[in-house]
A protein has these predicted regions:
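Helix-loop-helix hairpins in multi-pass membrane proteins, especially solute transporters
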Residues: 1-110
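Glycine/proline-centered helix-kink
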Residues: 49-62, 118, 193, 225, ...
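Small-residue-rich alpha-helical segments with characteristic i,i+4
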Residues: 272-348
Length: 421
């Protein structure tokens, strides 16, 4: 709703006419023209909102760093009140076609059940590893809740005359592939954690410095958005644009593979962020255009619902859980591996241990305290090296996954869908 209002007041265009059922183009040429318009318009819209999102993230990190985390909520409440005031001041004469309030809460129960399903799934994926999966009763109940709420939602939607979600949308081939592409994108995009882990472990940066480093993603969004608009207008096929997007994600992972080391440079960490955000923008803004080719407008709300579910909830949750759990497992693997050779027989480890013990004793520590401090220092160095090795290994596997996705989107057939009514 906010997007359509923004387009109406900023561009003096009634965007709802492009999505109202019954206003679909009647010919193939009309649909092709609409696809070209979407290919140029959607990247600009996504660029605008993604830049705003990054600015919000940076501002949140600054407020937390300079003040306290509670101030973030105070700021958000004040900003919402300001937005309400601006809305009343700048849009006082909006006329509705009827006297009835335009928001319908008839299907509030359906949406609530759907949200319960997603909440339970997200809880299981996020806290499963921490709580030892199904040995914890909360994970068990969350799984039961997700299954029961999911079955109830499907039953309600199938039996209703005017359902909240139309399952016929899943019969459209491009829609199914759109969901798959978004899933692959958001899972692989979870590799953005490599930069934060590397800078946090290897460079000892805090959250605010990491957030400041993340501002370079806006440059990548801008490059990706401009490139997407230009290539789309030139008529470049979707498969080549999708392949380019996954290629950029792979290049970002490859950069991290060769860059991760004990003496990394903070200034160089902006490059994987720019490369990854460029590839993300290519895919993020064009997948909806591909998925909704010749799609009847009656399926638009169902498409948006499923798109947001996959793009904003399921895929990021799965990707974050996958990368964090694998990182922890590989980190433990390398700690065990490196610790086997660290003893007093190892010249370098022995010299470092002895030097730390002597330094602690010079500071007035007892011999036992000095030995304990030296052991902790040795353990810390092993953990750092193990984490860097785990990040390097995962970056390599991410590169292979991106290459696989790139080949997949190139060899996939892209036939024009027959017109539906």
């Amino acid at each position: 709703v906010n997007l359509f209002t923004l387009i109406k007041y900023a561009g003096h265009m009634e965007a709802t006419e492009k999505i109202t059922p019954g206003n679909e183009p009647l010919t193939g040429k009309g649909w092709d023209k609409l696809d070209i318009e979407r290919s140029a318009a959607q990247p600009a819209i996504y660029l605008f909102f993604m830049v705003l999102g990054q600015l919000g993230t940076s501002l949140t990190a600054w407020l937390t760093y300079e003040y306290e985390w509670q101030y973030v909520y105070y700021f958000m409440m004040g900003l919402l009140l300001l937005c309400i005031l601006i809305t009343f001041v700048t849009m006082p004469y909006h006329k509705y076609t009827t006297r009835r309030f335009p928001i319908n809460f008839k299907q509030f129960g359906n949406a609530s059940i759907f949200c319960i399903t997603l909440t339970c799934i997200t809880y299981v994926l996020t806290y499963g590893k921490v709580l030892d999966w199904y040995d914890d009763p909360t994970i068990q109940w969350a799984t039961v809740g997700a299954v029961v709420a999911g079955i109830l939602f499907v039953h309600i939607e199938v039996t209703l005359r005017n359902p909240y979600y139309q399952f016929d949308v899943l019969k459209l081939r491009t829609i199914r592939f759109g969901f798959l592409f978004y899933f692959l994108l958001m899972v692989l995009n979870s590799s953005s954690m490599f930069v934060n882990v590397f800078t946090g472990i290897g460079m000892k940066l805090d959250n605010y410095q990491n957030a400041t480093l993340g501002n370079w993603s806006m440059l990548g969004y801008f490059i990706g958005g401009i490139a997407t608009i230009w290539l789309s207008v030139k008529g470049v096929h979707f498969k080549y644009l999708f392949a380019a997007g996954f290629l950029f994600l792979g290049l970002s992972a490859m950069f991290m593979y060769f860059e991760v080391q004990g003496a990394g440079l903070y200034e160089r960490m902006k490059y994987p962020i720019i490369i990854r955000s460029t590839g993300m923008m290519l895919l993020y803004s064009l997948i909806p255009t591909f998925a909704t080719q010749r799609m009847p407008y009656k399926y638009l709300s169902s498409w948006i619902c499923t798109m947001l579910t996959v793009r904003m909830v399921l895929a990021p949750s799965i990707g974050t859980a996958l990368y964090s759990n694998v990182l922890q497992e590989r980190q433990q693997h390398y700690i065990t591996r490196y610790a086997q050779n660290v003893d007093m027989m190892h010249p370098e480890a022995s010299a470092s241990f002895t030097q730390t013990v002597q330094g602690m004793q010079y500071q007035g520590k007892s011999k036992q305290e000095a030995v304990n401090m030296a052991a902790i220092s040795t353990k810390g160095r092993i953990q750092v090296q193990a984490t860097l090795s785990a990040v390097k290994e995962m970056a390599g596997w991410t590169l292979y996954a991106c290459l696989f996705c790139m080949i997949f989107v190139v060899v996939l057939p892209y036939p024009k869908r027959k017109l539906l009514t």
